[in-house]
C-alpha cells in the first residue's frame, strides 16, 4: 500500500488477535497489516493468516521488534505478557494498543475519549465489559454526577479462551477503575460471569448507576440512547434490550433513584461466532482507535514532507 498507510502488527494469534486480523483486512483504512505474531506455531490464527497472505511468526514480540517499519502494535496476548511487551515497544518507539487489562497506558473508550491520548505511546482498551458498559455510565454522568456504578457482564463460556480466563482478576479491577476514570462514577464495581449454557448466549450486560442528586430522567434516557447510537457506528450489534429504568431504592447513599440499563452485544461474525460479542466489541474498538492513531501518524508524515 506504500506511503499512504501505516504498517501495523498484531501480537497474539488467539481468538481476539485473529478476529482483529479479519477486521483490519476487511476495513484497513489508513493501516496495513504486515504481521500476525504468536507463540504457538500450530495455532489456527497463524494458519488462517498464512492462507490470507499475511506474514506470520511464532516468535512473538521478537518478530515485531525485528521489523522497524511497524509503527502500531495491537497486543492481544495477556495482561502479564503485555507488561513485558509494553516496555519493549516503548523503548523502540512503537505505539501499543493494548487489548489486555494490563493498563500500562491511559484508558480509551471510543465514544468517550477517542482522541484524548493521541500523544501516548501506549493506550489501554480496558476490557470487553468496560467497552460495553462504560459508555452508558458516562452517558449518565454527563447529565448528573454518579456516586456509584456497578456492571455485570455475562458472556458465553465458549467465547472465553485461555487469555480471557487468565485475566479474570485483572478484568474486575480494570473495569471497575474504568467506570470511575472514564465513566465518571465516584465508585465503580465490576462483575463478570462465564455462562456455560448451550447454545451459547449473546454477551449481556446490566448497568446500575446511582446519581448523587436530582436529575431529569428524560435527559438521562436521551443521553444513553445517543451514546448507544455512537457505539453502533462501529459495533452494529450493540443494543439496549429495554429502555432505561428509573426506580427508587434504599442505597448506602440514602434513598436514591437508581438507573438500570440492560444491553446485549452481538458479534459481527468476522471470525468469531456472533455470540462472542464480548470479543467483537474489543476488536472493533481496537480497529477504531488504531485508525485514529494511523491518521495522525500520516498527517505528521505529510507535515515533514
UniProtKB/Swiss-Prot annotation:
Enzyme class: oxidoreductase
SMART domains the record matches: Semialdhyde_dh (SM00859)
GO MF: acetaldehyde dehydrogenase (acetylating) activity; NAD binding
Catalytic activity: acetaldehyde + NAD(+) + CoA = acetyl-CoA + NADH + H(+)
Biological process annotations from GO: catabolic process
Keywords assigned: Aromatic hydrocarbons catabolism, NAD, Oxidoreductase
Cross-referenced SUPFAM superfamilies: Glyceraldehyde-3-phosphate dehydrogenase-like, C-terminal domain (SSF55347), NAD(P)-binding Rossmann-fold domains (SSF51735)
One family name in Pfam for this protein: Semialdhyde_dh
Active-site residues, as the UniProt record annotates them: 128 (acyl-thioester intermediate)
Residues annotated to bind NAD(+): 13-16, 159-167, 278
EC identifiers of the protein: 1.2.1.10
Transmembrane segments: none
UniProt record similarity statement: Belongs to the acetaldehyde dehydrogenase family.
NCBIfam families documented for this protein: ac_ald_DH_ac (TIGR03215), PRK08300.1 (NF006157)
Protein name: Acetaldehyde dehydrogenase
Amino acid at each position: 500500500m506504500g506511503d499512504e498507510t501505516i504498517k501495523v502488527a498484531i501480537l497474539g494469534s488467539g481468538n481476539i488477535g485473529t478476529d482483529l486480523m479479519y477486521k483490519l483486512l476487511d476495513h484497513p483504512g489508513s493501516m496495513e497489516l504486515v504481521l500476525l505474531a504468536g507463540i504457538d506455531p500450530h495455532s489456527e490464527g497463524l494458519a488462517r493468516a498464512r492462507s490470507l497472505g499475511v506474514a506470520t511468526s511464532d516468535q512473538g514480540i521478537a518478530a515485531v521488534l525485528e521489523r522497524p517499519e511497524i509503527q502500531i502494535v495491537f497486543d492481544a496476548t495477556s495482561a502479564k505478557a503485555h507488561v513485558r511487551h509494553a516496555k519493549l515497544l516503548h523503548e523502540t518507539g512503537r505505539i501499543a494498543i493494548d487489548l489486555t487489562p494490563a493498563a500500562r497506558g491511559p484508558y480509551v473508550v471510543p465514544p468517550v475519549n477517542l482522541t484524548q491520548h493521541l500523544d501516548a505511546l501506549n493506550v489501554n482498551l480496558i476490557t470487553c465489559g468496560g467497552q460495553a458498559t462504560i459508555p452508558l455510565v458516562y452517558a449518565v454522568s454527563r447529565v448528573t454526577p454518579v456516586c456509584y456504578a456497578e456492571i455485570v457482564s455475562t458472556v458465553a463460556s465458549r467465547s472465553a479462551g485461555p487469555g480471557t480466563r487468565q485475566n479474570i482478576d485483572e478484568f474486575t479491577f480494570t473495569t471497575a477503575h474504568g467506570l470511575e476514570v472514564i465513566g465518571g462514577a465516584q465508585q465503580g464495581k465490576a462483575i463478570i460471569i462465564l455462562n456455560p449454557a448451550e447454545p451459547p448466549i449473546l454477551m449481556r450486560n446490566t448497568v446500575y448507576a446511582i446519581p448523587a442528586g436530582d436529575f431529569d430522567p428524560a435527559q438521562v434516557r436521551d443521553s444513553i440512547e445517543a451514546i448507544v447510537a455512537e457505539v453502533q457506528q462501529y459495533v452494529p450489534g450493540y443494543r439496549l434490550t429495554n429502555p432505561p429504568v428509573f426506580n427508587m431504592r434504599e442505597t448506602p447513599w440514602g434513598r436514591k433513584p437508581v438507573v438500570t440499563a440492560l444491553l446485549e452485544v452481538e458479534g459481527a461474525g468476522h471470525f468469531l461466532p456472533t455470540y462472542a460479542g464480548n470479543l467483537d466489541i474489543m476488536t472493533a474498538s481496537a480497529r477504531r482507535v488504531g485508525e485514529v492513531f494511523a491518521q495522525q501518524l500520516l498527517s505528521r508524515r505529510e507535515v515533514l514532507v
